[in-house]
Amino acid sequence: MKASAVTAALAVGASTVLAAPSIKARDDVTPITVKGNAFFKGAERFYIRGVDYQPGGSSDLADPIADADGCKRDIAKFKELGLNTIRVYSVDNSKNHDECMNALADAGIYLVLDVNTPKYSINRAKPKESYNDVYLQYIFATVDAFAGYKNTLAFFSGNEVINDGPSSSAAPYVKAVTRDLRQYIRSRKYREIPVGYSAADIDTNRLQMAQYMNCGSDDERSDFFAFNDYSWCDPSSFKTSGWDQKVKNFTGYGLPLFLSEYGCNTNKRQFQEVSSLYSTDMTGVYSGGLVYEYSQEASNYGLVEISGNNVKELPDFDALKTAFEKTSNPSGDGNYNKTGGANPCPAKDAPNWDVDNDALPAIPEPAKKYMTEGAGKGPGFAGPGSQDRGTQSTATAEPGSGSATGSSSSGTSTSSKGAAAGLTVPSLTMAPVVVGAVTLLSTVFGAGLVLL
């Protein structure tokens, strides 16, 4: 979604610090945790079976979790599909979300949430300017709004900010945002909610970005990594699609890995990839994925068509339902990597990977108070934005500076001698990737909402 330049300043009252909202959340929900390179629900391996959910897309931005009636309408379809997770790209952090989140919890459905909006996000063309205290106040307020729900599975710190070689120079700012979110969650004494990044469907630097998000000190590392993948276009297979090579490339990776978008629509969608994604061919490395997308929008990826209170199932709905019904999760733990662990940071390889060193920008000075005082009230969709406002970072962070009281939510070792240490960047010999329209037309803004 193309965000317009923001010219009005967002006034954040430094003297008025509001407590996190009082949330009446379900107590009988089992939170999802991280062990090694996998997600767990209690003692049981958890595989994401979900869809991307943003009715209206970028042309009619709305918060689906604040729309209780629409949420309950769609939960009936989620249950019919057998989903356990939805991803939402943008929410209004000034609104109440209790009714929908509790209804999702009652249905056994978890939320993976992008903290950004088109107006509050890292601009890949101006990452230094857009990484500022006004931006951090917004995303921290979003954490406040959702941390109390036990079915909040994870937060995305960014979506497709890096979409080619040159834009990889923004990677330190994406990683800094991830660090800041993790520190905020711990400093505010919330439960350990995983934070990670959703990468674009590009071969250029996908693996380097994954390595980068899992290198350095524990406070600098992500809790998981996800990427969008439209390379399996039916009719295809595990090998023809190149997915076998991706499994090979990511074998030994120390963080949970899943597909944040999948479902090529070049041909008729049969979702043949589902049988591979939840088989032992992949479950040692992958933890499932999210199908793009629930509602029919301009890019024609929809499973259903929504008109007011009416929901019409499209052919892809039945195809996905059938694919899920035919595919069970593997028994046991799916051969996950129990050790986990950090890997070395990738070396600069311009123009594909244009990151000079491992240093990250320090959190902007005015944003430090949020760690102890809280972020205060979120401005919501009506806020003026943060792209060109606020105080920027003026220093380089010391490793460990983003630490806070509490253990790592990744539950993995910070040593580069762990199982992930052998992860190396292969030559780009994968099968040709058919990139979805979402990636091809993504804008210069690394907004949390990139829908077409």
Swiss-Prot record:
Composition bias (Polar residues) maps to: 325-340
Q: Which Gene3D superfamilies match?
A: Glycosidases
Q: What is its EC number?
A: 2.4.1.-
GO CC terms, sorted: fungal-type cell wall; plasma membrane; side of membrane
Q: Where does (1,3-beta-D-glucosyl)n 1 bind?
A: 89, 159, 292
Tell me the superkingdom of the source: Eukaryota
Q: Which SUPFAM superfamilies match?
A: (Trans)glycosidases
Q: Which cysteines are joined by disulfide bonds?
A: 71-100, 215-345, 233-264
Keywords in alphabetical order: Cell membrane, Disulfide bond, Glycoprotein, GPI-anchor, Lipoprotein, Membrane, Signal, Transferase
Q: Which family does this protein fall into?
A: Belongs to the glycosyl hydrolase 72 family.
Q: What is this protein called?
A: 1,3-beta-glucanosyltransferase gel1
